[in-house]
Amino acid sequence: MIRVAINGYGRIGRSILRALYESGKRQQIQIVAINELAKPEAIIHLTQYDTTHGRFQHKVKLVDNHMLIGDDAIKILHEPDAAKLPWREMDIDIVYEATGVILDRQSCEAHIHAGAKQVLISHPSSADVDGTIVYGVNHDLLRAGHTVVSNASCTTNCIVPVIDVLDKHFGVKSGAITTIHSAMNDQQVIDAYHDDLRRTRAAGQSIIPVDTKLARGIERILPHMKDKFEAISVRVPTINVTAIDLSVTLAKTVDIASVNQVLELAANGRFNGILGYTDEPLVSCDFNHDPRSSIVDGTQTRVSAGQLVKLLLWCDNEWGFANRMLDTSLAMIAAKQS
């Protein structure tokens, strides 16, 4: 049994916990502790009730500063200094680092010094970590000596499996990406101050361009794609599910049917459970709570002049990513034991 702790219990932290109990991986992973500065009553309430994902299927109670879920008792901590967390006493194998602010190796090593054996960051990180993993594409690079690993981003997990499939079958020469991302909690409900002037504006009233490092994230997973991609991102007034508009120039001549065929085969084969394919006339809310990293919308595939291909990809940017956190952590332990 892997003993884990969650540091930072926001959207991703709570999704990780709920995904664990819904995924069938609870027999492999035990959440021992949650470190979150919010009040325990709020932690319990937001675990039980969620606007996006609905009510948690298990009853959650607060007893003696523990979250009780069935027979499981999860210690609730409120420690702002990661170096002071009781990971050694709790025998923590992996910390899910989900604060969104501890993103480099030196900061993550505070967890290691506190006694945790490994750290998995739920965010793109600095380049000095042991590895940035998109599960299903490069998790085989994990090694026993890796202590600090990044799970990349939800959009990197969405797009990289698709690029990988296209490159292996047709060769990818270059690409351009537009991420159409649901609003996030770094935006404002009504106009208010923010360092990014666009994010001073009400999230529910505008389509808001934001910076993205997605293209650089692709390069970290697929180094041979260096300088071949650029990306922009806009936030839209929905609370969950993201679409990615991907345009790629291929080395081989293709048509819509051949592109869709290789993606559907990959979804049913090598990337089963990670990549999906649909030809139904669906909309974003239909992918809410979908555990896969990416779903190709085959109805929107377009080909121009035989080599320029446009695709529409969907992902639940919370739930799919949380499930990959679980998968990557299991792969880290497997590598450590090999």
Curated annotation (Swiss-Prot):
Substrate binds at S153, C154, T155, R199, T212, K213, R235. Keywords: Cytoplasm, NAD, Oxidoreductase, Pyridoxine biosynthesis. NAD(+) binds at R11, I12, N317. One of its GO terms (biological process) is pyridoxal phosphate biosynthetic process. One of its GO terms (molecular function) is NAD binding. One of its GO terms (cellular component) is cytoplasm. SMART domains: Gp_dh_N (SM00846). Pfam families: Gp_dh_C, Gp_dh_N. The keyword Signal does not apply. Pathway: Cofactor biosynthesis; pyridoxine 5'-phosphate biosynthesis; pyridoxine 5'-phosphate from D-erythrose 4-phosphate: step 1/5. InterPro entries: E4P_DH_bac, GlycerAld/Erythrose_P_DH, GlycerAld_3-P_DH_AS, GlycerAld_3-P_DH_cat, GlycerAld_3-P_DH_NAD(P)-bd, NAD(P)-bd_dom_sf. The active site is at C154. SUPFAM superfamilies: Glyceraldehyde-3-phosphate dehydrogenase-like, C-terminal domain, NAD(P)-binding Rossmann-fold domains. It is found in: Cytoplasm. It catalyses: D-erythrose 4-phosphate + NAD(+) + H2O = 4-phospho-D-erythronate + NADH + 2 H(+). Its EC number is 1.2.1.72. The record marks H181 as: Activates thiol group during catalysis. It comes from the Bacteria. NCBIfam families: E4PD_g-proteo, PRK13535.1. Homotetramer. Belongs to the glyceraldehyde-3-phosphate dehydrogenase family. Epd subfamily. HAMAP family: E4P_dehydrog (MF_01640). Catalyzes the NAD-dependent conversion of D-erythrose 4-phosphate to 4-phosphoerythronate. This is D-erythrose-4-phosphate dehydrogenase. The lineage of its organism: Bacteria, Pseudomonadati, Pseudomonadota, Gammaproteobacteria, Alteromonadales. The gene is epd.
